[in-house]
């Protein structure tokens, strides 16, 4: 009965929202929904997390309605047929890019860095999250 349900676990914006049903302390014959919102503010992150030379981020914005959208497609079965559906009808366009405040460890991030070798300098792609970029 004390189990929490994870509503949002957004690693990109460091937010986790859980929900659980508890007894109303003011009226023990009723249940209420308790929501817990955990936001970890990564203080030493960059404006552009893929560019280690960009300035430190000083502004963090969170929109609860956007965080709670369930836009990832999921498969459901109706009348012995499998359909792909989204749990929200207000999902952003495909070109929408969420602002990430830290690395999503499931994504591969790279950046170009200057490498000097034998008197010449050239730009080389460097991996910022190696575990996500290279298969096991």
From Swiss-Prot:
Pfam families: Ig_J_chain. It comes from the Eukaryota. GO terms for biological process: humoral immune response. Keywords: Disulfide bond, Glycoprotein, Secreted. Disulfide bonds join 12-100, 71-91, 108-133. GO terms for cellular component: pentameric IgM immunoglobulin complex; secretory IgA immunoglobulin complex. Serves to link two monomer units of either IgM or IgA. In the case of IgM, the J chain-joined dimer is a nucleating unit for the IgM pentamer, and in the case of IgA it induces dimers and/or larger polymers. It also helps to bind these immunoglobulins to secretory component. This is Immunoglobulin J chain. The lineage of its organism: Eukaryota, Metazoa, Chordata, Craniata, Vertebrata. The gene is JCHAIN.
């Amino acid at each position: 009965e004390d189990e929490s349900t994870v509503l949002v676990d957004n690693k990109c914006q460091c937010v986790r929202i859980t929900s659980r049903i508890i007894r109303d302390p003011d009226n023990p014959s009723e249940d209420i929904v308790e929501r817990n919102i955990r936001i970890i503010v990564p203080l030493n992150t960059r404006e552009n997390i893929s560019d280690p030379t960009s300035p430190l981020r000083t502004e963090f914005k969170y929109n609860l309605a956007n965080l709670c959208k369930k836009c990832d497609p999921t498969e459901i079965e109706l009348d012995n047929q499998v359909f792909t559906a989204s749990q929200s009808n207000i999902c952003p366009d495909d070109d929408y890019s969420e602002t990430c405040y830290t690395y999503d460890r499931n994504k591969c991030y790279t950046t170009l860095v200057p490498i000097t070798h034998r008197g010449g300098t050239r730009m080389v792609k460097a991996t910022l999250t190696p575990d996500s970029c290279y298969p096991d």
